[in-house]
Amino acid sequence: TNTGDNRLAALVANNGVGETSLSKTGTGTWILTNPDSTYTGVTTITGGVLGVDKLADGGLASSIGMSSGASANLVIGNGGTLRYTGTGDTTNRGFTLAAGTTAIQSSGTGAVEFNNANAIAYSGNGLRVISLGGVNADDNIMGASIGDQNASNITALAKNDAGKWILTGDNAYTGSTNINGGTLVLGNGGTTGSIASGTVNNFGLLGFNRSDTLTYGGLIQGSGDLQQAGAGVTVLTGDNTYSGSTDVLAGTLRINGDQSSATGLTSVAAGA
């Protein structure tokens, strides 16, 4: 239950007979600092925080071993948090999220990129909230596609803490998107990165960074800011009520909905 940064520097390997698996239980925090662990079993977080200094592609040594990138090999349970604490890594590992609230955080000195574009796997039945958080303000990227488990078990997304996360998957979840702090960006300058037309409760910064045309028809509300940063065209068709600023840094922001209740200031950079 100790929530301080308990650290384990040992190299975790298979036992010579079978696979070793690692399970983080309880409400406390453990940080795995050895980048060369080679165990090939499942890493499970059933509670609290599991911090990792090193992430790598499936099959390569890392703080959570060298199991394959299959989603079944990294499981985050209700109330569990995977916290990246390293200097910057990219991984193609998938993961499985339980029903309830699960979290992925980036709080190292460098950003982390999950570049596996497959759909996130789910276990158990029930509503779920996926939280992306941490204090790292660099370009942390979630490439996996976030969807509902089914029509009865929908998913919502929360962006917590002061850091920045970029969604590059084309996400189909139908729950709300809640930006409680920091920055959430759709797209990383390419032609992917979107959310379904649900409600965005924005109390941070919502960014659009695509090179093509993206239409968003959901409601954007809250006191947060909106930023058009990509070279493409973003079309807002919802009746938005947010009170933060609207900043067009590049490309085109087109309003095809009722923006009269969006009361913040609007600025347009030269050339946008």
Predicted feature locations:
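Beta-strand repeat architectures
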Residues: 1-9, 13-31, 40-141, 147-168, ...
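NAD(P)H cofactor-binding loop motif with strongest signal on the N-terminal glycine-rich segment
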Residues: 35
